[in-house]
């Protein structure tokens, strides 16, 4: 699924998603007038109780059958503005001015901000529905799938009989392209894939025929094929139910595929607004241009990670990474891993040369994190071998030699997995040095401060705490913690998946520079195939615990051998 450019160069055509979701002929924008207006936000201002203003007079209109992309990075105020449509204000904030007016399909007009708590609860899920980023937040793990949708109907007194509600459950399951069988409705959430869970969440949101749908980054973390299915479902359900949808995201590539109109927010202000093709292909504001310039593209034409420096310089100085007659730096041989009777990795073979960056690609449930953790000694229950410079590594990191522990370092998806919120950054980064027991405290501090500079943080960050840092700064500190013992291999587990595109680009640039300067080898675990040419020299594609494609980046992307890889490539959203 890609977004093509019109012959006149003025913008994209949406044939792929438009046609695949039932649109007839060429894409045409929804009608916007007083009759189709559903939600109007005017001069909305929110502030902290100390008086700091967070939203500075935001105006948003939503119309029936339209999807509006509300775009911005962390701290832009996009989620705060979107949640106001639900009558929700985050703890510590208060509305100081403005109105939120809902025009229901039954002809009623509602002042959302004047509703009582009971009235707001009644409105949510019936007139205004919400789909969170993580389906686990909308699905009760202790309730069967069908019962959860039925509960929404029961709470809002849908229909006149139990049989009518039961039929509505089956109808909405069919609408989101999931089975409506008794067996499927009786499943538990953990028995569904991430994409299936998200589609159940969409079914719950549409069960009561809402007027407005608020979607808060609902495809973050999904592989591109699953993301494509979810986006099609959102588009289909919006068109079929004549709903006004607000899609909150930092992913402009997804916006280009899905929405009719784009609103860009920066620090509590709307800085640009217009039809999707005008904003994405002829942006007026510098911030919009910055966001667009940071989107990773499969072709690698945008140099978001500084890879030209790697290609031209590292090989000249250190020698290009290439298959060696000797043992590779890191080698995985016939690795298998099972949880009880469930085998999640099937005979994995993988090799990483010195200075090489391998992108390990897979969807949720593919086994990629299990493999990464096994390599790092964090999943000791595997069979098979992991070797470093030809020497077999103990299965558990605790049983590995000090040199082996120092040589292979793991960076978690969440920086808080390695940064203790009660410790300063310097104290957390010092832990590997303390455990090694080879340096004085003064020497440890010197190394930590030098490493802070290496990850482009000031030495003053030594005395700051994780909660005081932005998401990108915390991830840099987590990378620094992995670097203090001068490893040869960094295992990076989805470390940019939760970051804004510009912050992601800065982390990719940092990793490229570290490889250039230190000759590091990387195993970069991700579900995002568009990052391949920006971070990797090789790609290994993992599907259901089996590596189905493996080779140099250009070979895998230009000539994929497996249908799964071809499917991923066909479904990449792009601009």
Language model regions located:
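Conserved ABC ATPase signature
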Residues: 188-192, 196, 465-469, 473
């Amino acid at each position: 699924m890609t977004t093509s450019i019109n012959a006149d160069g003025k913008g994209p055509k949406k044939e792929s998603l438009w046609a695949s979701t039932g649109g007839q002929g060429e894409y045409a924008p929804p009608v916007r007038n007083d009759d189709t207006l559903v939600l109007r936000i005017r001069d909305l201002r929110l502030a902290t109780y100390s008086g700091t203003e967070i939203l500075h007079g935001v105006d948003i209109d939503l119309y029936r059958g339209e999807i509006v992309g509300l775009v911005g990075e962390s701290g832009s105020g996009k989620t705060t503005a979107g949640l106001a449509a639900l009558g929700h204000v985050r703890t510590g904030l208060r509305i100081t001015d403005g109105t939120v007016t809902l025009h229901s399909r039954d002809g009623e007009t509602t002042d959302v901000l004047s509703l009582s708590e009971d009235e707001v609860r009644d409105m949510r899920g019936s007139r205004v529905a919400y789909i969170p980023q993580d389906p686990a937040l909308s699905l009760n793990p202790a309730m069967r799938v069908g019962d959860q949708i039925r509960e929404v109907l029961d709470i809002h007194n849908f229909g006149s009989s139990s049989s009518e509600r039961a039929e509505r459950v089956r109808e909405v399951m069919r609408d989101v392209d999931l089975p409506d069988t008794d067996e499927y409705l009786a499943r538990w959430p953990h028995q569904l894939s991430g994409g299936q869970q998200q589609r159940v969440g969409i079914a719950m949101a549409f069960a009561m025929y809402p007027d407005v749908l608020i979607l808060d980054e609902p495809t973050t973390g999904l592989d591109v094929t699953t993301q494509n299915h979810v986006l099609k479902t959102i588009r289909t359900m919006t068109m079929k139910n004549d709903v006004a949808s607000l899609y909150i995201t930092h992913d402009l590539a997804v916006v280009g595929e899905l929405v009719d109109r784009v609103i860009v927010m920066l620090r509590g202000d709307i800085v640009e607004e217009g039809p999707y093709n005008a904003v994405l292909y002829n942006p007026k504001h510098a911030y919009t241009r910055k966001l667009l310039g940071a989107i990773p593209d499969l072709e690698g034409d945008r140099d978001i990670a500084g890879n030209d420096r790697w290609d031209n310089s590292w090989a000249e100085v250190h020698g290009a990474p290439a298959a060696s007659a000797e043992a590779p730096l890191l080698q995985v041989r016939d690795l298998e891993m099972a949880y009880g009777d469930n085998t999640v990795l099937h005979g994995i073979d993988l090799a990483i040369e010195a200075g090489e960056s391998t992108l390990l690609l897979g969807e949720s449930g593919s086994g990629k994190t299990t493999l990464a953790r096994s390599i790092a000694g964090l999943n000791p229950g595997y069979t098979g071998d992991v070797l470093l410079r030809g020497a077999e590594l103990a299965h558990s990191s605790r049983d590995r030699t000090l040199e082996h522990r120092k040589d292979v370092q793991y960076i978690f998806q969440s920086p808080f997995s390695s940064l203790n919120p009660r410790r300063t950054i310097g104290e957390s980064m010092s832990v590997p040095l303390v455990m090694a027991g080879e340096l004085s405290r003064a020497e440890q501090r010197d190394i930590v401060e030098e490493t802070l500079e290496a990850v482009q943080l000031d030495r003053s960050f030594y005395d700051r705490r994780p909660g005081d840092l932005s998401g990108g700064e915390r991830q840099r500190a987590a990378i620094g913690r992995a670097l203090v013992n001068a490893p040869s291999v960094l295992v990076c587990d989805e470390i940019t998946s939760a970051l804004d595109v510009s912050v992601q680009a800065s982390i990719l640039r940092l990793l490229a520079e570290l490889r250039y300067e230190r000759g590091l080898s990387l195993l970069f675990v991700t579900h995002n195939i568009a990052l391949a040419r920006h971070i990797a020299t090789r790609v290994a594609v993992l599907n259901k615990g089996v590596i189905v494609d493996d080779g140099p980046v250009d070979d895998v992307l230009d000539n994929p051998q497996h249908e799964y890889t071809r499917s991923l490539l066909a479904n990449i959203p792009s601009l």
